[in-house]
Regions:
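Amphipathic alpha-helical interface elements
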Residues: 1-101
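Accessory interdomain/linker segments of ATP-dependent helicases and helicase-like nucleic-acid enzymes
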Residues: 93-145, 441-579
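Short nucleic-acid-contacting surface segments enriched for D/E, G, S/T with interspersed K/R
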Residues: 120, 157-179, 564-566
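Mg2+/Mn2+-dependent nuclease catalytic core
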Residues: 141-171, 314-423
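OB-fold/S1-family single-stranded nucleic acid-binding modules
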Residues: 172-204
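Pre-ATPase regulatory/linker segments immediately N-terminal to the P-loop/RecA-like helicase/translocase core
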Residues: 217-220, 396, 401-402, 410-414, ...
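A non-catalytic, helix-rich entry segment at domain boundaries
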Residues: 244-321, 507
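Contiguous mid-protein beta-loop-alpha structural module that forms a pocket-lining wall or clamp
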Residues: 390, 400-463
Length: 639
């Protein structure tokens, strides 16, 4: 329709291509929601040459820019893209282009988007894996046009050899993020990081907990999701210590009172405290009370004295507690305990023990805690654009107390991301094969021989570490064949649902899953009613201890826009002042919709933010739906 705006015609053409490509891959083994990978797959299926493929990718990239409002549509470009799609359909459907359409198409190909100039260094690039030989990975870039696959060097000592195990797990059309890429004169890429399926976010604390005294096998991740926490006491103590930190950070002239703080703790965690089996023992209850008092005093000492010492870049007046981050670059997400608002310094707090045995007479951070710190540093670097060399990260062990300045080791970060990739590959395998035999072989790795990578021996291993691994194995082996079949089938079902909730549904029209937060264009979100934007603060009550909330005004959208939000929805709130702002480059705040009308939105925040500057009053905000992994955690535990 000539009378329709070009932008609308672009959207219709894009939807048409997405629908056709999705139909053409149905019943095939391709498991990806990414349009670039789907185009490559269909191009191979219907023998589109490299020029025809690139014309479709040119349309994909142009429509991305137009639908994200980064570019104004031009008629000449639209006709070029219409021609590319029409000629592709001609091959896919083995039918001639209707004469009415053919008559308006350009008679000759109009040159595609110009090739990007060769760069010597690329911060980050998304690619689609094709195949590998002994020297290179061969990949297709997602965001630029290339006439042939790009060669990527892997297993290079000192640069990316840590990803050797990741490479063995790759499958055709897998999505990869390549970070810190050096490009030589021949256009060969050498990345520092290879991140598999980055849209599948793994929680930082869950990843760090895979680092045990006996090794860091991916089976630790699967074991922890299937086994309930034996002793809730350390977790409770950690939560109460976080509450103490909050009180001391936001204390004015008057010091917080310990008894008042404990009353707050009982109001905040009544069921957890009442249900904790250890606290039913009077002697252990006394010990717990004593521990709480000790942590309270230690946190006071750190905040009132250590913070002020020269060399520590910490200012409690400009702190943010429990900020959340989503890092699509590395495929991870997490929440910090304490951060300076300018992101120059942050603290990860631990109420448990540090490593008291590795070096005699010296307390050192535990490996899993160091890993957690390193991942937060990497998130701030790759998501928020901070320079790791200028960061001041600290581990705070409130038990001693010890405020430990952490050092960056990017080789260790690469090893951790390799572990993340192996976990994601296993999750992909479970939902892709969806077969009991595959899952049986995967979970068979939960055994002491496989997981004891450091070959520990002696009393510590035999008495404290090995039994928890063996117990799961024994329980699973003791099941009847029918019970085992039920267990594996249900495990597959939950994992498939979890994978879909993160990466999206292959058969779903449009985008779904948590990854839609950064993969969908603004227009797609508007059309699905999945975003409220240009919100402004009416009332900021984020500092209230028990019912922290924020009241926002909803602007007048056009009448075609129908928001898909209701009371009780779990949401993400973030600053959105530019079209480029999204959940992967902004601090995010999680909460629930408490009340919504046509003009106002009230969000109950999950955490209290007493620093008013966290929510600048002149800023504009956006709200989108959030997904919660905790639901799946309880499903796995139900097994």
């Amino acid at each position: 329709d000539e009378n329709q705006p070009l932008e609308r015609r672009y959207r219709q053409l894009r939807e048409s291509l997405e629908r056709v490509v999705r139909e053409k891959i149905q019943g095939n083994s391709l498991q990806t929601t990414d349009l670039a990978a789907r185009i490559n797959y269909v191009a191979t299926q219907y023998e589109l040459d490299i020029k025809e493929q690139n014309q479709l990718h040119t349309f994909r990239l142009t429509s991305n820019d137009i639908l994200n409002h980064r570019k104004f549509p031009a008629k000449e470009e639209f006709l070029r893209d219409l021609r590319a799609v029409a000629f592709a359909y001609r091959k896919m459907f083995a039918q001639d282009i209707p004469l009415k359409l053919f008559s308006v198409l350009p008679k000759q190909e109009i040159t595609s988007l110009g090739k990007k100039e060769k760069k010597e260094y690329i911060r980050r690039i998304r690619v689609c894996f094709d195949y590998a030989d002994d020297t290179y990975l061969y990949v297709h870039p997602v965001d630029i046009i290339a006439d042939e696959p790009i060669r990527v060097v892997y297993n290079k000592p000192g640069i990316n050899h840590e990803f050797e195990e990741t490479i063995k797990e790759l499958w055709r059309y897998a999505q990869l993020n390549l970070l810190d890429v050096f490009v030589d004169r021949e256009g060969i890429y050498t990345p520092s990081f290879i991140v598999l399926e980055p849209d599948y976010l793994i929680d930082i604390s869950s990843l760090a907990e895979c680092y045990k005294d006996y090794g860091s096998h991916p089976a630790n991740y699967f074991l922890s999701r299937l086994v309930p926490i034996d002793n809730a006491r350390p977790l409770l103590l950690g939560n109460i210590a976080n509450l103490f930190l909050d009180e001391w950070i936001h204390a004015g002239e008057e010091e917080p009172d310990y008894i008042d703080c404990m009353k707050k703790a009982f109001r905040q965690y009544p069921i957890e405290l009442a249900a904790c089996a250890e606290l039913r023992d009077p002697s252990k209850e006394k010990e717990f009370a004593k521990d709480c008092r000790m942590h309270f005093e230690h946190i006071r000492d750190i905040v009132q004295h250590t913070f002020l010492e020269p060399g520590y870049n910490l200012d409690k007046k400009d702190a943010v507690l429990e900020p959340s981050y989503i890092c699509e670059a590395l495929g991870i997400q997490g929440r910090l305990d304490y951060m300076q608002r300018d992101m120059s310094s942050f603290i990860e707090m631990k109420s448990g023990k540090a490593d008291e045995f590795s070096i005699q007479g010296k307390v050192e951070p535990k490996e899993n805690n160091k890993v957690q710190m390193l991942l937060y540093m990497a998130v701030l670097e790759y998501s928020m654009g901070q320079d790791r060399r200028r960061m001041h990260p600290y581990l705070l062990y409130t038990r001693y107390p010890l405020l430990y300045p952490a050092r960056a080791s990017w080789a260790q970060v690469r090893r951790v991301i390799n572990l993340r990739n192996r976990i994601v590959a296993a999750e992909y395998g479970v939902q892709f094969h969806n077969h009991s035999d595959f899952t049986r072989n995967l979970l068979a790795q939960i055994n002491p021989e496989v997981m004891n990578e450091r070959k520990l021996r002696g009393r510590f291993w035999e008495q404290y570490l090995k039994p928890s691994i063996s117990r799961f194995r024994e329980k699973l082996s003791a099941l009847e064949p029918l019970e085992q079949a039920y267990f594996y089938t249900l495990y597959n079902f939950i994992t498939k649902e979890l994978y879909t909730s993160k990466s999206g549904d292959v058969d779903y029209e449009g985008r779904a899953g948590a990854s839609a937060l950064w993969l969908s264009t603004l227009d797609e979100k508007r059309e699905a009613g999945e975003i409220l934007y240009d919100l402004q603060i009416i009332e900021n009550k984020a500092s209230q201890v028990h019912k922290a909330y924020i009241l926002l005004s909803i602007p007048q959208y056009d009448e075609m826009f129908l928001p898909n939000f209701r009371t009780g929805d779990v949401v993400i709130l973030y600053e959105r002042n530019h079209d480029s702002d999204n959940v992967t480059n902004k601090m995010v705040f999680k909460g629930n919709i408490e009340q919504i009308t046509d003009t106002e939105l009230r969000i109950r925040l999950r955490a209290t933010y007493r620093n008013v500057s966290v929510f600048p009053p002149d800023s504009r905000y956006a709200v989108e739906h959030d997904t919660m992994d905790t639901t799946f955690r309880s499903m796995y535990l139900g097994l």
